[in-house]
Amino acid sequence: MKSFFKPVIIKKFLWTLFFLFIYVLGTKLTLPFVDMSKAAAMDGTSTTLNYATALMGGNLRSMSLFSVGLSPWMSSMLIWQMFAVSKRLGLSKLPLEVQERRRMLLTLVIALIQSVALVLNLPLQEAAGVDMTTIMVLDTLVLMAGTYFLIWLTDLNAAMGLGGSIMIVMASMIAYIPQDIWNSIQELKISSLWLALMLVFSLVFLYLAVTVERSKYRIPVNKINIHNRFKKYSYLDIRLNPAGGMPIMYAMTLVSIPQYFLLIIHFLQPENQLIEQWIEALSMGSPAWFILYLLTIFILALAFAFINISGDQIAERMQKSGEYIENVYPGGATRRYINGLVTYFALVGAFYLILISGLPMMVVLVDIRYLRLSMIPGIFMIFIGMVFSIKDEVEALTLNDRYRSLL
């Protein structure tokens, strides 16, 4: 705990509080020309999009400047990283400025799609001298500007504060999801006994999630020209769940993307019954949505594992620095060995994520009112990963303070 009271940490923490204040202020700035007395005309898709945006720093409840949140930016980052892993495309070899420019263009496209889909289904009210087309264009631009403002805010927080984009997402989750869970408890009229059992289960699950999050498989690595007494401190760590809780957060967002396209098509073809059926079929709580959600978690768990631990890059780095794994030849053999282990633990992590966060949501197929409660395990895993990420950042910033002077 002493690490959190270092001057550098306190300074960064204060900057983060300032940025969070700006974020909260932005969530109170309502979009112009929106009739807030009426619910957004999104039919059964509102629940799906509400939770997807809340997990990405957005907020569809108040229809504010930051309603879209960081979803376009984080989605573009994920898509770029998945393609950058391939050496054939050569994306990782491009200059950093070119990579950043292309990522931001991809963000622009995704932000445009999401903003248009939301605006087309908002209860807009005409103003004197302003036609509806102008109002739609204006609100779309405001939502896109809000997304890019949040990106700029997270960049500032990454440079001057703690947590980067994590803090924005955590603020969004803390602001709305606990209240939603409490509303569900009151709506379902859950007894005190069941609440006590849920609390005990939550504590047990919290312990299990933290244990799995910090569990690692260590591969001893030998370093040439380093004395043997340091050998025991040289390891290549692979986490039991290499992807962490990120697949859960991204899965909710990616599964909601078809909803945005369907909302746009439904606006253009309001009489199309087939589109309405697809919207209902892909709404949260339907069997099709549930299967797509589990499949997305599984695929993302594998993808994030290889994004976080690239056997090609590690093998190349070890070969250049004179490191090698015991009984494994450098180069191709090392790459295959590491990729094999990553594949094994990625599969373990994928099934673990599906078991812990996916299966509890089966109750939603019976009664959609249990949605918020069934999401608690997944939210815990996302939150735990974020907390440990901030903890690791604090430890890295205070690393030099742990050593005593030799003089």
Swiss-Prot record:
GO terms for cellular component: plasma membrane. Keywords: Cell membrane, Membrane, Protein transport, Translocation, Transmembrane, Transmembrane helix, Transport. It comes from the Bacteria. Pfam families: SecY. GO terms for biological process: intracellular protein transmembrane transport; protein targeting. It is a multi-pass membrane protein. The keyword Ribosomal protein does not apply. The chain crosses the membrane at residues 13-33, 65-85, 104-124, 133-153, 158-178, 190-210, 248-268, 287-307, 345-365, 370-390. InterPro entries: SecY/SEC61-alpha, SecY2, SecY_dom_sf. Its main location: membrane. It is found in: Cell membrane. HAMAP family: SecY2. Part of the accessory SecA2/SecY2 system specifically required for export of possible cell wall proteins. The central subunit of a protein translocation channel. Belongs to the SecY/SEC61-alpha family. SecY2 subfamily. PANTHER family: SECY/SEC61-ALPHA FAMILY MEMBER. Component of the accessory SecA2/SecY2 protein translocase complex required to export cell wall proteins. May form heterotrimers with SecE and SecG subunits. This is Accessory Sec system protein translocase subunit SecY2. The lineage of its organism: Bacteria, Bacillati, Bacillota, Bacilli, Lactobacillales.
